[in-house]
Amino acid sequence: MGAITLDGKATRDEIFVDLKQRVAALTAAGRTPGLGTILVGDDPGSQAYVRGKHADCAKVGITSIRRDLPADISTAALNDTIDELNANPECTGYIVQLPLPKQLDENAALERVDPDKDADGLHPTNLGRLVLNNPAPLPCTPRGIVHLLRRYDAEIAGAHVVVIGRGVTVGRPLGLLLTRRSENATVTLCHTGTRDLPALTRQADIIVAAVGVPHLLTADMVRPGAAVLDVGVSRVDGKLAGDVHPDVWEVAGHVSPNPGGVGPLTRAFLLTNVVELAERE
């Protein structure tokens, strides 16, 4: 018997129905939310991501605010654009699309964003608020992972969760989310220095693979019935590949497909962050 699919697309559509109603209420009150994007250069992947985000905005009624800049832009010109969106009353929240060209300092750009307009939830101030369990925009992918587990009734409270990957967008903030009292999981954060990864994953109730190593997690590393979320993205022979080997579906109880699992929820919670920022105003 195969695993239950953690369907990110269907779950995203449910979230969009709720967001559309909330945006309509905000618009009726004269506070239409606006999502801004700053895109530097012509990287095809980044362009596709930004197009997708603005298409999502149109579905729920959020105003789109795009700032597309040339690849050879100076730091001063990028800073001017960030400052403009910080001051723009129509822009409720926004993102600086990464990666940036090599002449630009990504960390400096992200720190210049107003923390109260941080749609990604990755500003250092907001990550600090997450540590303190204070209200703040939450990182979108970790929030999507938690929501997807809850949507399919995967038990989180008391569960042992093994997270493979310690990146700032997924691994580290996910550990903080899952150990809040509202989730109450026990988290093991694994990385390249982990000595015996299979021994740890075999103990896990939930495994989140987020390293970008194709088919890293195989069936022999998974306890029967465990929930497995595939967040990593890489390419093999020109095709997208996740971190989870297809044979895991025969062992696990729940698996998120890749694509179509966590990815749609990352975008859904980007919009959710913007709507919540508008509701707080």
UniProtKB/Swiss-Prot annotation:
GO terms for molecular function: methenyltetrahydrofolate cyclohydrolase activity; methylenetetrahydrofolate dehydrogenase (NADP+) activity. The keyword Coiled coil does not apply. It comes from the Bacteria. NADP(+) binds at residues 165-167, 192, 233. PANTHER family: C-1-TETRAHYDROFOLATE SYNTHASE, CYTOPLASMIC, C-1-TETRAHYDROFOLATE SYNTHASE, CYTOPLASMIC-RELATED. This is Bifunctional protein FolD. Its EC number is 1.5.1.5, 3.5.4.9. It comes from Mycolicibacterium paratuberculosis (strain ATCC BAA-968 / K-10). Keywords: Amino-acid biosynthesis, Histidine biosynthesis, Hydrolase, Methionine biosynthesis, Multifunctional enzyme, NADP, One-carbon metabolism, Oxidoreductase, Purine biosynthesis. Pathway: One-carbon metabolism; tetrahydrofolate interconversion. Belongs to the tetrahydrofolate dehydrogenase/cyclohydrolase family. It catalyses: (6R)-5,10-methylene-5,6,7,8-tetrahydrofolate + NADP(+) = (6R)-5,10-methenyltetrahydrofolate + NADPH; (6R)-5,10-methenyltetrahydrofolate + H2O = (6R)-10-formyltetrahydrofolate + H(+). Homodimer. CDD domains: NAD_bind_m-THF_DH_Cyclohyd. Catalyzes the oxidation of 5,10-methylenetetrahydrofolate to 5,10-methenyltetrahydrofolate and then the hydrolysis of 5,10-methenyltetrahydrofolate to 10-formyltetrahydrofolate. GO terms for cellular component: cytosol. GO terms for biological process: L-histidine biosynthetic process; methionine biosynthetic process; purine nucleotide biosynthetic process; tetrahydrofolate interconversion. Pfam families: THF_DHG_CYH (PF00763), THF_DHG_CYH_C (PF02882).
